[in-house]
Regions:
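Short, exposed "boundary/linker" segments that immediately precede the start
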Residues: 1-3
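Double-stranded RNA-binding/processing signature
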Residues: 8-220
Length: 220
């Protein structure tokens, strides 16, 4: 992938991949100047590449399990996680309001931008280059991504198997209504095991459950 910082010199498609609708609206840009159409295209490329990868690499899994595994990889939180090595949030063109309320770290914006990048690569370099990007930055560490996606369910099954009680406790809520930050703790038999943060209680619980699973895995 070309460095997103170079997008200024790479023409319209490479500007659009990083342009959020809030920026386009604020700057009164022409119609379809944001990255939403590229996101649509990138989503389709991501689906076929991820499907082919899982079909080839997991020959023993039935259709239902493959579908669930694919969902764990292409879901919003996981795609946002995949943007970290690219530092994609740094290069996004956001409206001032979106920028000031944490838009560069918002999972929905990051995951949409990643799909837009895939769409831009497809248009510029064809399917082979887009596939290479997906395999390099997304279709890696599958087991860990599935663990992240299913963290609450997997943790629930683990704790039940140990005949212990699992609960979640909201320990902090901060920020304005449009940009809330929640901190949630995982309690096992009343003892705090891990914490997680997120812009919703559900996201914070998922992160806390994931951290708890990593702790249990390291103890094994």
């Amino acid at each position: 992938i070309r460095d997103p910082e170079m997008s200024r010199g790479l023409g319209d498609v490479y500007k659009r991949q990083l342009t959020h609708s809030s920026y386009a609206n604020e700057k009164h840009m022409k119609k379809h100047s944001d990255n939403e159409r590229l996101e649509f295209l990138g989503d389709a490329v991501l689906e076929i590449v991820s499907s082919e990868f899982l079909f080839i690499n997991y020959p023993q899994k039935p259709e239902g399990e493959l579908t669930k595994l694919r969902a764990s990889i292409v879901c919003e939180p996981t795609l946002a996680l995949c943007t970290k090595p690219l530092d994609l949030g740094k290069y996004l063109r956001l409206g001032r309001g979106e920028d000031h309320t944490g838009g560069r770290k918002r999972k929905s914006i990051l995951s949409d931008a990643l799909e837009a990048v895939i769409g831009a690569i497809y248009l510029d370099g064809g399917f082979t280059n887009a596939k290479e990007f997906v395999l390099r930055f997304i279709m890696t560490d599958i087991e860990n991504k599935q663990l992240f996606y299913d963290s609450k369910t997997i943790l629930q099954e683990l704790i039940q198997g140990r005949h212990e009680q699992l609960s979640y406790e909201l320990i902090d809520e901060s920020g304005p209504d449009h940009d809330k930050q929640f901190t949630v703790a995982v309690l096992v038999d009343g003892e705090r095991v891990s914490e997680g943060e997120g812009h919703t209680k559900k996201a914070a619980e998922q992160q806390a459950a994931y951290q708890a699973l990593l702790l249990y895995r390291n103890r094994e």
